[in-house]
A protein has these predicted regions:
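Alpha-helical DNA-contacting segments of helix-turn-helix folds
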Residues: 57-64, 108
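Hydrophobic alpha-helical connector segments
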Residues: 59, 74-100, 153
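Amphipathic, non-transmembrane alpha-helical scaffold segments
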Residues: 61, 65, 87, 120-131
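Short, structured motif recognition centered on aromatic/hydrophobic residues
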Residues: 13, 19-22, 68-69, 91, ...
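Helix-turn-helix
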Residues: 2, 10-13, 17-55, 59
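A cross-kingdom feature marking solvent-exposed beta-strand/loop segments within repeated
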Residues: 37-42, 48, 52-54, 78, ...
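Short coil/turn segments at alpha/beta junctions that flank glycine-rich nucleotide-binding fingerprints
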Residues: 24-28, 79, 101
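Hydrophobic/aromatic-rich alpha-helical bundle segments in the mid-to-C-terminal region
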Residues: 105-109, 120, 124, 139-187, ...
Length: 198
């Protein structure tokens, strides 16, 4: 029997470094040899794990969309019908993503159009489901908010939270806890402001 440790698998290491390099230099600006060197294997050695760069990009972007949706659904279950707790948990979960996976945000912004049609459609489908989960949560807390306004507010909050790559290098953040608390307050304030207009 194999026991899982906290150490990332070789495949996870490859994906993490590919995301970092793609975010820094663009998908077409990075070769398999560079990704391989970043994880200590030859470029051709990557083909034992992935058929090519396209497969890495697809796994990164489809994978994060799947994880965000699964995390959102888990938070719905854990909130046990408390709409304020759910909205707070959704915000916190997305903040964790926005702080910890900044390269994936950059990658999504710049490289989504590089995915094969089927993968791009899958990402968009997962994202729509994630947005709708948030829209329902926002409308539970702010029932006077029209559905279209709630959806617009959710997209605006995603823009706010997903701005973390623009805060400078990872080490330039004022501290994870301070940044997370600020983002949480701003997100809650945005939803409250949207509801105040009704």
């Amino acid at each position: 029997m194999s026991i899982r440790t906290d150490a990332p698998t070789r495949r996870e290491q490859i994906l993490r470094e590919a995301a970092r390099l793609f975010a820094e230099r663009g998908f077409h600006g990075v070769g398999v040899d560079e990704i391989g060197a970043a994880v200590g294997i030859s470029g051709p050695g990557l083909y034992r794990h992935f058929p090519g760069k396209d497969a890495m990009l697809a796994e990164l972007l489809v994978g994060i969309s799947e994880r965000l949706l699964a995390g959102g659904r888990r938070r719905v279950e854990e909130a046990d019908g408390d709409p304020r707790a759910l909205l707070s948990a959704l915000i916190d979960g997305h903040i964790d993503f926005a702080i910890n996976d900044r390269a994936l945000i950059t990658l999504h912004d710049r490289e989504l159009d590089r995915l094969r049609d089927a993968d791009r459609k899958r990402v968009r489908q997962l994202q729509r489901q994630y947005v709708e989960l948030w829209v329902e949560a926002v409308r539970e807390v702010y029932p006077a908010l029209e559905e279209a306004d709630a959806r617009a507010a959710v997209h605006a909050v995603f823009g706010l939270l997903n701005s973390t790559p623009h805060l400078g290098p990872a080490g330039a953040l004022t501290g994870r806890t301070t940044t997370a608390a600020l983002l949480h307050r701003l997100a809650r304030g945005a939803f409250a402001a949207a509801a105040d207009g009704n």
